[in-house]
Regions:
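Bacterial N-terminal signal peptides
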Residues: 8-21
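N-terminal secretory signal peptides that target proteins for export/translocation
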Residues: 1-7
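Eukaryotic scaffold repeat domains enriched in small/polar residues
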Residues: 24-371
Length: 371
């Protein structure tokens, strides 16, 4: 009897260990979302152009950047200001932006980021696509108060000399301020091929790097860059194609979207290469990583990645960088996407997306399950 009991206990222990091992190996269940078709409310009979970017500040105010000059001429008199601030219910709180004294407003609005101090950063990619070089392009990043007062401009329009330039950027796609170090990370990707880092207060250049932590090429890249996902072996070419997004996680990992090479590369904040991941390909549609957001839990378990190829948001388990789910399909309906471009998340885990070209809208996706 004693032997029989021992055997049963041993079997139970082995079964438990096997179950725990299987659970540890299984990917986490992807969170699910429901679109809020009423968000946001656009007042004053305003018209939006291409909505190029979106961000959420420390108060859960949502900042939307759009391109008024992309609106058809017949509707342009009703164009909303380029910068719109909403609350989570979709109510407009403020609006501003455009050309002004003392700064170079972008020729083509591209990225917006609201930092932990609620300063609002604007980037542009005016001058693209055409041959890159001195005298062309939005070669600056702008920092504003939430009320639209200029605080800082890094760089000047048409002044970039390329990847080695420590004063100007060149048609930057995106920016992110790492609150812990007060450093501004720039996806300097339409005219250059680098991540550039500046002091967020003074604008002083600190460092830059290319793909795999390599030194970026001295010569300016073709504009637009040629997709090269199969060059350089299975990991792709040794330099970035188009650096379209950059984010830093709470644990200090820098995420970079290399749009034309379908790869997500991660680095330390000093620029040391860590790992690479790719979006899963579906059929013949080439994946296009274009933007990031993190889940709201303390460990930021999930990484959300804009995939402008099949027009969806991919969900990654951040620990393994395994793709475990997707949000959305291509189409015009609420919850669908057509040229989804950038994204953001609020403190409750809800997601916000920006669409250019056809749909020209911002959308909100409410977190309905987290695991």
């Amino acid at each position: 009897m004693h032997t029989s009991m021992t055997g049963r206990l041993l079997s139970l222990l082995l079964l438990t260990l096997a179950t725990l091992s299987l659970a540890a190996q299984s990917p986490p269940r992807a969170p699910t979302f429901q679109v809020d078709p009423t968000w946001p409310t656009i007042p004053n009979d305003w018209v939006l152009g291409e909505v190029s970017s979106i961000s959420v500040d420390s108060r859960d105010h949502i900042w939307v950047l759009h391109r008024p000059r992309s609106i058809p001429e017949a509707q342009r008199a009703k164009a909303a200001p380029p910068v719109l601030e909403f609350d989570t219910s979709g109510k407009l709180l403020a609006s501003w932006g455009g050309a002004g004294d003392g700064y170079d407003w972008p020729e083509r609005e591209h990225g917006i980021f609201a930092d932990a101090k609620n300063f609002v950063w604007i980037s542009g990619n005016g001058g693209w696509p055409k041959p890159a070089g001195p005298g062309s392009g939005d070669d600056m990043i702008l920092k504003f108060t939430p009320q639209g007062k200029l605080v800082l401009q890094i760089g000047r329009r048409g002044q970039s000399t390329g990847n080695a330039d420590t004063v100007n950027v060149h048609q930057p796609a995106d920016a992110f301020v790492h609150a812990e170090t007060n450093e501004l990370y720039v996806a300097d990707g339409y005219g250059n091929q680098r991540v550039a880092v500046f002091d967020a207060d003074s604008g002083k250049f600190k460092r830059a790097w290319g793909a795999f932590g390599n030194t970026p090429p001295a010569a300016m890249a073709p504009n637009p860059p040629t997709p090269q996902p199969n060059q350089g072996g299975p990991d792709g070419p040794p330099q970035f194609g188009l650096v379209h997004a950059v984010k830093v996680s709470r644990d200090g990992v820098v995420y970079v979207a290399d749009r034309t090479n379908n790869r997500i590369q991660t680095f330390t904040t000093a620029g040391k290469f860590l790992r690479q991941a790719r979006l899963a390909q579906q059929g013949t549609v080439v994946p296009v990583p274009a933007g990031f957001a993190f889940s709201a839990d303390a460990k930021q378990q999930f990484l959300y990645v804009v995939d402008s190829g099949p027009m969806q948001v991919a969900i990654f388990d951040r620990e393994t960088m395994t793709q475990i789910g997707t949000i959305g399909v291509r189409g015009p309906k609420p919850g669908d996407f057509d040229i989804v471009h950038h994204m953001a998340a609020d403190s409750k885990g809800n997601l916000y997306t920006a669409e250019i070209v056809t749909n020209r809208r911002a959308q909100k996706f409410v977190l309905s399950s987290s695991r």
